[in-house]
């Protein structure tokens, strides 16, 4: 399985993601510059966290127009896998690949912490290695992570089972329905504010995030 990690000006978690996919999982991984227009060789595209284009206008608003993003949209439309982490989640909502939006945190402060999450659904390839209702711990680091959607969109997301992760216990940023991560209706595109790549190597204090990536590989082996 070949991974691609998109690099925008201002990305700062791209090497962390590549460390997980290339070094921990031993999978071929390519760094994809934001001006690239050929990603046909990739099975999985990951848009990492950071501050793409300095978060000018609003988070993800400029990155959405990068040449590579049209290719990412087409990649997703083919049913291929896409993951957006933190700023990557914001980019995916701006690009229309995921519903809703990410607004300023409720208290208007940047939050950096480890938080418990409940795995709401394992119907997506992204969460198949977890158990429904499992509580995991992942780091968060964001100033604009409050998930928002209008009432109709929120109801649709809930009814379709698109919420994959919720904040367990205290809601750190005011996200509606404690939403921490959602997928598209097909389940191949995932956006999440917590950072699974920062909880993949036990040396960092936890490895709950590694299963997110391992589940994909296990599925490929099962189908081989």
Swiss-Prot record:
Pfam families: GATase_5. GO terms for biological process: 'de novo' IMP biosynthetic process. InterPro entries: Class_I_gatase-like, PRibForGlyAmidine_synth_PurQ. Residues 3-224 form the Glutamine amidotransferase type-1 domain. Its EC number is 6.3.5.3, 3.5.1.2. One of its GO terms (molecular function) is glutaminase activity. It is found in: Cytoplasm. The active site is at 86 (nucleophile), 195, 197. It comes from the Bacteria. PROSITE patterns: GATASE_TYPE_1. Keywords: ATP-binding, Cytoplasm, Glutamine amidotransferase, Hydrolase, Ligase, Nucleotide-binding, Purine biosynthesis. Pathway: Purine metabolism; IMP biosynthesis via de novo pathway; 5-amino-1-(5-phospho-D-ribosyl)imidazole from N(2)-formyl-N(1)-(5-phospho-D-ribosyl)glycinamide: step 1/2. GO terms for cellular component: cytoplasm. It catalyses: N(2)-formyl-N(1)-(5-phospho-beta-D-ribosyl)glycinamide + L-glutamine + ATP + H2O = 2-formamido-N(1)-(5-O-phospho-beta-D-ribosyl)acetamidine + L-glutamate + ADP + phosphate + H(+); L-glutamine + H2O = L-glutamate + NH4(+). Part of the FGAM synthase complex composed of 1 PurL, 1 PurQ and 2 PurS subunits. Part of the phosphoribosylformylglycinamidine synthase complex involved in the purines biosynthetic pathway. Catalyzes the ATP-dependent conversion of formylglycinamide ribonucleotide (FGAR) and glutamine to yield formylglycinamidine ribonucleotide (FGAM) and glutamate. The FGAM synthase complex is composed of three subunits. PurQ produces an ammonia molecule by converting glutamine to glutamate. PurL transfers the ammonia molecule to FGAR to form FGAM in an ATP-dependent manner. This is Phosphoribosylformylglycinamidine synthase subunit PurQ. It comes from Trichormus variabilis (strain ATCC 29413 / PCC 7937).
């Amino acid at each position: 399985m070949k991974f691609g990690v998109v690099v925008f000006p201002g990305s700062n978690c791209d090497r962390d993601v590549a460390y997980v996919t290339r070094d921990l999982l031993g999978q071929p991984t390519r760094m994809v510059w934001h001006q690239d227009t050929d990603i046909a060789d990739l099975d999985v595209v990951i848009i990492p966290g950071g501050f793409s284009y300095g978060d000018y206008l609003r988070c993800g608003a400029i990155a959405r127009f990068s040449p590579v993003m049209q290719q990412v949209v087409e990649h997703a439309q083919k049913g291929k896998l896409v993951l957006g982490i933190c700023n990557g989640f914001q980019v995916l909502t701006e690009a229309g690949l995921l519903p809703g939006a990410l607004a300023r945190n409720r208290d208007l402060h940047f939050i950096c912490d480890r938080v418990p999450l409940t795995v709401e659904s394992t119907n997506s390839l992204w969460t198949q290695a977890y158990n429904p209702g499992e509580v995991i711990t992942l780091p968060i680091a964001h100033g604009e992570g409050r998930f928002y959607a209008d009432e109709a969109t929120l109801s649709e997301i809930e009814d379709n089972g698109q919420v994959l992760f919720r904040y367990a216990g205290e809601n750190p940023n005011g996200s509606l329905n404690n939403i921490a991560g959602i997928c598209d209706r097909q389940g191949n595109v995932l956006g999440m504010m917590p950072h699974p790549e920062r909880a993949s190597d036990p040396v960092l204090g936890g490895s709950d995030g590694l299963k997110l990536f391992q589940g994909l590989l296990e599925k490929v082996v099962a189908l081989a």
